[in-house]
Amino acid sequence: MKFLVLLVALLLWPSSLPAYRRVTVTPDEEQNLNHYVQVLQNLILSVPTKEPGRQKKSKSPNNANFIGPRVSRVKELKYTHDVGPGDNDVLINPVSEETTTFPTRGFTLEIDKKKRTKSTAFWSIKPSNVSVVLHAKEPFIEKDEPEPEPEPEPEPEPVEHRTGAPTQVPSVTEPSQDVTSLSGSTDLGTATEEEDVPQLSGDNEMDYLESHDMYNEDVLKRIADINSQLHHVPLPESYKPEYRADIRASKEHLKRSLALAIAAEHKLEKMYKSQMLPQGRSSGGVYDIITVINMLYNSRYKLSEYLDIKYVPLEMRGKATVVVHTLKRILCVGHGEETHNLLKQLLNNNIRILHILDTHDKDDSS
């Protein structure tokens, strides 16, 4: 009941202030206001939400989820941070006497220990999808549907990423009331959105190596399949056992035929060399005489055919005629007279025999 009364008093307190006016507070008022804000935080967090999967009540801020340094609320501390509808942090945007701009992005932290300024604080408490905003005009509670956060853009300055662990706010020298950040822990039942983790360059190399290994394994598997198929191919006709004896016998016959052909060719070459005159040699040598005599002797049974013009080919008849006339001239020179005389003697002998026979017949008749 005390919390409810305190909440109503706190919600009605800023409505008495004029709209759009900067309120300056003293350090005591600031301390009291910080205390009220902390009580309001505890009250808001104790109210359970009705979303599915988030039925767990939040605990008191005095436990381990609300560990943080004790810092002053408005001590020369400026936070400018881009806040989405799902951030679970307490934003402190003090307004100093000078004109202060509120950029939408970036994170700056400035601490000035010497200068003290009067400022008006602005708080925004947004655990899960329930947002409580305290304005100078009128406080209200709005419930927004969770919207997907845009992907974080890379920034040159290092920024602490929010995780499930509670984050801490840097402290200022002068101790004051606690300023805690509402972290989205498991006790609060709020699910923190997963951050996009940039891919490292080594992941692409690992993917390439894995794909390369898979390609090599595929090639080796195909080679093994082809090898197994080759082993299962049926044997050709020449490798069947029933044909091996015939193939072996055919090979032996072929070897013998080749040997006989080589021997016959060698013999023919030798015979041709013995029957023909070697080119470029003179006819007066002993080698020529031996060659001619051997040739005529080996062909003595067919000399009548060889020397007959009608058996000689047309392109060789001129040479054959010259050879025959040469042989006739050689063989017939110096023997013509002897032959003529021999023939005369034979004729005379025949005439005498005839006369003797004729006289003998006459005597028998008388």
Swiss-Prot record:
Residues 144-157 have a biased composition (Acidic residues). InterPro entries: Equatorial_segment. Residues 165-189 have a biased composition (Polar residues). GO terms for cellular component: acrosomal vesicle. GO terms for biological process: acrosome reaction; fertilization; fusion of sperm to egg plasma membrane involved in single fertilization; sperm-egg recognition. Belongs to the SPESP1 family. This is Sperm equatorial segment protein 1. It comes from Bos taurus (Bovine).
